[in-house]
Design a protein with these regions (language model features):
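Core structural elements
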Residues: 156-166, 188, 732-745, 764-774, ...
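Acidic, turn-prone loop/beta-hairpin segments
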Residues: 84, 213, 220-228, 674, ...
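Gly/Pro-rich turn-and-neighbor structural signature
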Residues: 20, 182-216, 225-227, 239-243, ...
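Catalytic adenosine-cofactor/nucleotide-binding cores of aminoacyl-tRNA synthetases and other
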Residues: 457-459, 672-676, 681-760, 848-852, ...
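Conserved phosphate-binding loops in nucleotide/dinucleotide-binding enzymes
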Residues: 349-352, 393, 464, 580-587, ...
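N-terminal, positively charged nucleic-acid-binding surface of large information/translation enzymes
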Residues: 1-294, 333, 350-383, 415-486, ...
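C-terminal low-complexity, glycine/proline- and small-hydrophobic-enriched intrinsically disordered tails
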Residues: 846-1017
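Conserved short loop/turn motifs at secondary-structure junctions
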Residues: 3-5, 55, 82-83, 150, ...
Length: 1017
């Protein structure tokens, strides 16, 4: 068929994608292959709730481009698609939709006609404007209804994501698509859980964890679950007054001086969290500071050392308190872990609210039991006396006020007394702080203290460190079966993965070295439920026993079981246990628990281990390439390496996949920024809608625009006007390719055949040379995942070499039409990964077959590549023709001569002389045999007559002088900028390089203008 004047994506994209789906081009079982190698990519399972944004689009374009490249090269490729259930995030989104009333009809329909106290409470909230408590009540009393609401949205979102993938042109193997809550995934999760348990890596313990008050669940301490927020809070200094001394071995006279010291010198602390004082168990002070204070007080050095030793050994117990607020029995602790340079050098120890405090109290001081000041709802506990039940932030304001009122907060220097304080009863925290800032101005309180607080990434509420009974995976525990810790498995694997960019290998090692035990339990309804079963008749307290206890004690076997419901029934029947009282652990697993098993789950590790060696795991594991964003590098990538090494080390050591990493190459793709270099976000309103860009320009144009920034680890600016500019550039490029094919069609070039005895023209040999350079650059770039370089190689070849020079030469010598058609064929194939839709249309038009199923053909050109060394003079000759043309064009611009005006020139180069017709056509150059002394040197071999064409030499001299002044000014500004230490220290390498390139260009302009002026004079 004849091609239209321009490529119109609206006419083709939907039909082409439907054809790809019908052909199942992503299914490796149906692909044409020419080599035995396989290639696999795992799609990072996107969260269900996410609409397509720039980051998603970039990641999918990258994976699809890599997959198409591998298929084109004859490798059996599997791009495995998946969807993540997004535990915390989805539950938060569904709760929000319930609060907004989206499911009111369904809820009303179900509760109508049911009469009991809990349902009546639900009905009351449904009828009210404030539905904030409705999700909690549904999960408590009608969990199946909440889950029905969730699944309704899940199915809709999954369909939406597949539609978005179609717009992009994604070609994964959808016949293998896996959802992280599918049975295959659940089976692997349950299997892994039991493996951890049997290997003594799994345990349950009361420990200080990150607690999301907003989502009412535990969080891990890595990026993804938590984030940081910079905010201002009051930083308050206050004192603890001496209460008592109890000595086990010393007489009263021995401790009299110490008591006298403390009576006169109460301990001053500083904190941003005064609301936790009722959970204070101790006051830790650095020994150097404590020693210096006692010596200054006049206590003998020997006695000071003895007192410190007795306090450390607990032979001497010193208690402090804040009697007026009900804080008593706070014990003095000597600890080198206190930062002596921060605050007062003394630290209030609240083990239930701070990990450092917990470590000092439990591990160093061995202080025993402690109390919590804040509960899981973010309210103060019963141990807080009159503040019990207050919100943690409001309690902060109240306690600050009461500490000042009771005289425990020192005055600022220069103030002898404070104001009379009566009562304080504001309930709004921000308003409270404004009032306190004014009323308490004389006290040592910095109300504008700026610091970072940990927040829940999903709910954006401030995380509360709390003691909670949770499940953990111990990363530093030795595995019973493998003999290594998970950390050791991870570090071994990190050394085997190729990282792009390489510096991420060190980041991975640093993360693993500092990795803490993984809290895997979440108080959610959505997600994988723990495969833990308790027999309440024998284990009413739901004690989680170790595998060793379970295996060795028959009584314990009737108390707990690990497995799914079917396995439980079999277990009960085999052991003749009563089935009536077994209940499942209510907690859900951290979303990242299943995600970290992704390479094992998708390819079928469990089935492979059970003997199915020919499945996907045996064929495609380890994954060839893993693509990810830097934001989930620690929380996901490092864990996948750790757990994949752990599980594959359980295979027979003779197995080919024994102890294998999950992926060979790890690519950190760029973060997409807006045109000002800011990260895109909904709150800033600076995001780029990929669907709108596709509607405006085409999917191919957006793909190429994004891949033009694909350098591993680098950020890419692509937003606002810049996005339009880059998309337009590549839409124009697509049209350029389209019109090249149209031109060759009019010449019937694609009907010609290229034979081995074909002898190309001067331009043909030059084109072969340029094509070889392009091909080498293209393949090397793909090898290094620098797709921007591969695309640029094609862009420059098509636009500058093929279109600008060779096709123009065909107009005067069409000998090379067969060669040109052949190379354009190859270029269309090379463009397929970057421009799949248009390439499909062009290829179908030329060959009447599917490009998506066509293997790359580049071997035929090698016949001429082998002869290039004998034809280098021809290539050099065409290069000289190009220089002459460019010289003529440049000199016209320099001397302000119209482009269409003929300029006489001479040349001593034989190839330039022989191709005068081409030069005249393309550059309006008129070849001459003789030259005058004032002719301008345009190349090493050629001169041009421009002086005779200048009608007003004086005006041109004046204009040139002005240009020289302007260029010198620009040059001076650039030189000053590059000499600025501030600029060099703060600018990015790219910006600095751009400035140096600008300076080189200005120097070149100046040299040309000065040469011109000399000639004019």
């Amino acid at each position: 068929m004849a091609l239209e004047s321009n490529y119109n994506p609206d006419l083709f994209e939907k039909a082409i994608y439907a054809k790809w789906q019908e052909l199942q081009i992503g299914n490796p079982d149906l692909q044409n292959v020419s080599i035995s190698e396989t290639h696999s990519i795992l799609m990072p399972p996107p969260n269900l709730t996410g609409d397509l944004h720039a980051g998603h689009a970039f990641q999918h374009y990258l994976m699809d481009t890599l997959s198409r490249y591998e298929r084109m090269n004859g490798r059996r490729n599997l791009w495995f698609p998946g969807v993540d259930h997004a535990g915390l995030q989805l539950e938060g989104v569904i709760d929000g939709l319930i609060i907004k009333g989206e499911f009111d009809t369904e809820i009303n329909k179900l509760v109508d006609g049911i009469n009991n106290e809990s349902i009546e409470e639900i009905k009351t909230i449904l009828a009210s404007k404030d539905k904030s408590q409705l999700p909690l009540l549904l999960k408590q009393y009608l969990p199946s209804l909440w889950l029905d609401c969730a699944w309704t949205k899940v199915n809709m979102w999954r369909d939406n994501q597949k539609n978005q993938s179609a717009v992009l042109g994604d070609t994964p193997d959808y016949s293998r698509q896996l959802f992280t809550l599918d049975k295959k995934a659940s089976d692997m999760v349950n299997f892994a859980f039991r493996e951890y348990w049997e290997d003594s890596l799994m345990y349950k313990n009361s420990y200080l964890i990150n607690w999301s008050v907003g989502l009412q669940t535990a969080l891990s301490d890595v990026s993804g679950d938590t984030d940081f927020l910079t905010r201002k809070d009051p930083f308050i200094n206050f004192i603890y007054k001496f209460e008592s001394i109890k000595s086990i071995i010393k007489t009263n006279s021995d401790i009299h001086q110490l008591e006298d010291y403390f009576v006169n010198n109460p301990i001053e602390v500083a904190t941003v969290r005064p609301e936790t004082i009722h959970g204070d168990m101790g006051i830790a002070i650095h020994p150097e500071i404590f020693r210096a204070k006692l010596l200054d007080f006049g206590i003998d050095k020997g006695q000071v050392e003895s007192l410190i030793s007795d306090i450390v050994s607990k032979d001497l117990i010193v208690n402090f308190g804040i009697k007026e607020l009900g804080v008593v029995g706070v014990q003095l602790i000597i600890s080198e872990k206190v930062d002596k340079d921060f605050g007062t050098g003394a630290l209030k120890i609240t083990p239930a609210s701070d990990l450092t405090d917990f470590d000092i109290w439990v591990n160093d001081f061995e202080g025993g039991e402690f109390v919590s000041a804040i509960n899981k709802q973010g309210l103060l506990t019963e141990s807080c006396g009159p503040y019990s039940g207050q919100d943690r932030f409001q309690a902060r304001a109240n306690i600050i006020y009461d500490l000042c009122k009771a005289g425990y907060v020192p005055l600022k220097e220069g103030f002898a007394s404070g104001p009379t304080l009566e009562s304080f009863n504001y309930t709004d925290y921000d308003k409270s702080i404004e009032v306190l800032k004014e009323q308490l101005a004389v006290f040592q309180i910095n109300f504008d203290y700026e610091h970072n607080v940990t927040i829940c990434e999903r709910s954006k509420t401030i995380v509360e460190p709390l003691i909670s009974d949770e499940f953990f995976i111990g990363v530093a525990r030795k595995s019973v079966n493998t003999g290594l810790t998970l950390q050791e498995h991870a570090l071994e694997g990190i050394g085997e993965v190729s990282f792009y960019p390489f510096e991420y290998q060190d980041r991975a090692r640093n993360f693993i070295h500092t990795l803490k035990d993984w809290c895997i339990s979440r108080n959610l309804l959505w997600g994988h439920q723990f495969p833990v079963w308790y027999n309440l008749a024998e284990n009413p307290d739901r004690v989680f026993y170790s595998y060793q206890d379970w295996k060795s004690d028959d009584e314990v076997k009737n108390k707990i079981f690990i497995g799914d419901e079917i396995q439980l029934k079999e277990y009960i029947n085999e052991n003749n246990y009563s089935p009536s009282s077994w209940v499942q652990e209510e907690k859900r697993l951290d979303t990242w628990f299943s995600s970290s098993l992704w390479p094992l789950t998708t390819f079928g590790y469990k089935e492979y281990m059970n003997g199915n060696k020919s499945n996907d795991f045996g064929t495609f594991y380890p994954t060839s390439t893993m693509v990810t964003a830097k934001e989930i590098f620690n929380i996901w990538i490092c864990r996948m390496i750790m757990l994949s090494k752990y599980f594959t080390s359980k295979l027979e050591n003779t197995d080919n996949l024994y102890n294998k990493i999950p992926f060979k190459d790890l690519i950190i793709h760029p973060t997409i920024l807006d045109d000002q270099g800011k990260k895109m976000s909904k709150s800033l309103g600076n995001g780029m809608d990929p669907v709108k860009q596709i509607d405006k320009y085409s999917s191919d144009a957006l793909r190429m625009a994004m891949m033009s920034g694909m350098i591993p680890g680098r950020n890419m600016r692509l937003g606002g006007n810049l996005a339009d500019k880059v998309c337009e550039k590549y839409r124009n490029f697509g049209n350029k390719v389209w019109n090249i094919v149209r031109f060759l069609e009019t010449k019937e070039a694609f009907k010609t055949h290229l034979t081995n005895d074909f002898d190309p023209s001067l331009s043909g040999w030059w084109l072969i040379s340029k094509y070889k350079q392009c091909l080498d650059r293209y393949e090397k770039a793909f090898d290094n995942y620098e797709l921007s370089e591969a695309l640029e190689a094609l862009y420059q070849f098509v636009w500058n070499d093929l279109a600008a020079w060779h096709l123009e030469y065909l107009k005067v010598n069409d000998l090379d039409l067969p060669l040109t058609a052949h190379i354009v064929n190859d270029i269309i194939q090379l463009l397929t990964p970057f421009m799949p839709f248009e390439s499909e249309v062009l290829w179908d038009n030329i060959t009447v077959q599917s490009m998506a199923q066509t293997l790359r053909r580049v071997e035929d050109i090698n016949h001429w590549n082998d002869q290039m060394s004998f034809r280098s003079k021809l290539v050099d000759g065409f290069d000289e023709i190009i220089k002459t043309v460019e010289g003529l064009r440049s000199v016209k611009g320099l001397f302000n001569i119209p482009a269409g005006e003929l300029v006489n020139y001479t040349s001593t180069n034989q190839y330039v002389i022989e191709n005068a017709e081409f030069i005249k056509m393309i550059a309006k150059g008129n070849a001459q045999n003789q030259e005058a002394d004032d002719w301008y040197q345009i190349t090493l071999f050629s001169k041009a007559d421009v002086i005779s064409l200048i009608k007003d030499k004086e005006s041109e001299i004046l204009r040139t002088n002005k240009q020289i002044i302007a260029v010198k000014k620009q040059k001076h500004i650039l030189e000053s900028t590059l000499q600025s230490r501030d600029f060099i220290d703060n600018a990015t390498p790219d910006v600095i390089k751009h400035k140096y390139d600008d300076l080189d260009a200005r120097n070149n302009d100046l040299a040309l203008l000065e040469q011109k002026l000399k000639l004019l004079k």
